[in-house]
Design a protein with these regions (language model features):
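Glycine-rich, charged/polar anion/phosphate-binding loops
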Residues: 1, 68, 154-158
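Active-site-adjacent C-terminal substructures of enzyme catalytic domains
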Residues: 114-168
Length: 168
């Protein structure tokens, strides 16, 4: 059969907040957290090899405030579910994070507790050597998305050197 990992995504900051997502797709943080907990309690199967799992998945660093990142990773770890987000996907997004927080994306994620073997990032095309070292040291995963990145004419994550170095 097919294993189904439902990622409960969210966008909680919009353009009115100085973020990138349009305001008409924004949800309230408390609503997202409550719904994520509801999904975990009702549908997540923690058994090894389970067919249905729930994943905590705020969309990206530029689309949710610190409180959401900190509370959502805490919720996920309380229930032992994995967490996922888009990370370092495009130059404009990386520049936005750098200007807003004075840190690169993975450095910011680490500051918020969003690293570890229970976390994986989609894309990760804009990583510098320090970010790669953080990912390796913390056991954080990367989901390479070459087809998606080609549709948007973005870079692809250069996973070959990471795999050769081991620890990824």
């Amino acid at each position: 059969g097919i294993r189904f990992h439902l990622a409960r995504g969210s966008l909680t900051l919009g353009q009115k907040d100085g973020a990138l997502p349009p305001d008409n797709v924004i949800e309230k943080e408390d609503d997202v957290l409550a719904d994520t907990e509801r999904l975990i309690k009702n549908f997540h199967n923690p058994a090894h090899g389970a067919m249905v799992r729930i994943v905590n998945a705020p969309s990206s660093l530029f689309s949710s405030a610190d409180r959401m990142w900190i509370q959502s990773i805490g919720l996920a770890r309380k229930y032992g579910v994995q967490s996922h987000t888009h990370m370092a996907e495009a130059p404009d997004e990386e520049q936005f994070i750098l200007e807003k927080y004075g840190k690169r994306s993975v450095e910011r994620a680490e500051q918020l507790g969003w690293v570890g073997p229970d976390v994986w990032y989609a894309h990760a095309t804009m990583l510098d050597d320090n970010e790669k070292a953080i990912i390796k040291r913390t056991g954080t995963g990367i989901c390479n998305c070459p087809s998606s990145n080609m549709y948007t004419a973005a870079k692809v994550c250069d996973v070959s050197p990471m795999l050769r170095e081991g620890g990824f």
